[in-house]
Amino acid sequence: MLQKISSDSYRRLLAPVLSSSSSLSSTSINRTEIERITIIINGHPFPNHPIQPILAKHIPLSSLSPEFVSEVLGRLFAAHSNGLKALEFFKYSLKSSKSSPTSDSFEKTLHILARMRYFDQAWALMAEVRKDYPNLLSFKSMSILLCKIAKFGSYEETLEAFVKMEKEIFRKKFGVDEFNILLRAFCTEREMKEARSIFEKLHSRFNPDVKTMNILLLGFKEAGDVTATELFYHEMVKRGFKPNSVTYGIRIDGFCKKRNFGEALRLFEDMDRLDFDITVQILTTLIHGSGVARNKIKARQLFDEISKRGLTPDCGAYNALMSSLMKCGDVSGAIKVMKEMEEKGIEPDSVTFHSMFIGMMKSKEFGFNGVCEYYQKMKERSLVPKTPTIVMLMKLFCHNGEVNLGLDLWKYMLEKGYCPHGHALELLTTALCARRRANDAFECSWQTVERGRCVSEPVYRMLETSLSSNNELKKLEELKEEIQKLHSFLPPPEIQLM
């Protein structure tokens, strides 16, 4: 059976974690305190009970610092928390006379709201900030909202949002920087037809720069069309724009992803010849390209090139080398690189473990047992994986009949204050119900809803079938009531973007 957090344990979590007599500074922020606050917020049964009284009781306003607020919001974002909870916490922080809000905290709150399609609340927050804290409005906050509107809305709605920001929120005449943000919104969603249309329609007004052209070039590259990328590059040059190192980096990445590693290396040589700055990021891209080309010797040569050029390899460079070795089937070599990385004092991150998991899954030598070993190492480091890794591990555990490991992963995520992705819940529910463990599946679904996230229709139907056969329909009715309450606070299917 899946164990609930006991009432005593939860009360310990709710014990005041911050002393009202001392303020948290950037040097004294404690990871455990951040985690405990995240668990309190994420685990609170909102909207059934208001969250502000809990915040007031357990987080004294006098103890809040801008860094602490930003760290908590960052954890709530990573934890896929309900947007309204994040908004309530941000608003609570505004009550502190000692802690002025920061752009970072505002942007994180806005991002959490927009990601969950709470557009009414996002616009209201923008308007409130415009009125009370206008200095918090930034290019980044504009980009966050426009990108999500471009994702969930239409071409026309995105343009209307751009005009609304100019006239009602920022209240100034927009220039090329804002124009670039609008283009990036469409390019991020790989809507290159729309991005090109915007460019042709408005470029005479905004006088585009090389950054404008690089944004469009990146859009074509991300759309996976290397031919269109190169055609636009030549158009860019024809229009009189001078390519820079960013331009070359985009083109190199495009060729690497399309397995045209030779062309990527030719561009790299051109960069050297033209005396462009060679960055760790450029070399990291080429290391990834070596892996795609299944050339582990070149991957190592390029990695060593970083130090030869007086640069310092970062976690991303090590991850690229490990990933390339994994693609070439050299799992043992990747393990050695990970040890080398740790010896240099560079901490492995979620991408490191994701690469290790993928490599071991494909390896006959390490296989499932190797994944389990590194899963435990990840937990020992208190490292929380990103959503793709969670879903991948859940699928692996459940499909290999190790449903208890799936439950262990679920419990670990909740203990860290995270609400696992809906697809992870579907995988776990399917495996549990297939093994006649409907009560455990119900508990996972209840925990999801309690944290302000809805369960999918397939999950509910599986529970309905399994619990009906066990004569436990009362549980199902309770869950249905909670879902209906939650739906009243979630954005409707037909959302208002403006």
Curated annotation (Swiss-Prot):
GO CC annotations on file: mitochondrion
Give the lineage. Answer: Eukaryota, Viridiplantae, Streptophyta, Embryophyta, Tracheophyta
Q: Which family does it belong to?
A: Belongs to the PPR family. P subfamily.
**Gene Ontology BP, a term:** mRNA splicing, via spliceosome
Concerning PANTHER family, the annotation shows: OS03G0856100 PROTEIN (PTHR47447), PENTACOTRIPEPTIDE-REPEAT REGION OF PRORP DOMAIN-CONTAINING PROTEIN (PTHR47447:SF23)
The residue spans of each PPR repeat are 102-132, 138-172, 175-205, 209-243, 244-278, 279-313, 314-348, 349-385, 386-420
Name of the protein in question = Pentatricopeptide repeat-containing protein At3g61360
Matches recorded under InterPro entries: Pentatricopeptide_rpt (IPR002885), TPR-like_helical_dom_sf (IPR011990)
| Sorted UniProt keywords | Repeat
> PROSITE patterns recorded for this chain?
PPR
Say which species the protein is native to: Arabidopsis thaliana (Mouse-ear cress)
Which Pfam family is one of those matched by this entry?
A: PPR
Establish whether keyword Repeat is in the entry. yes
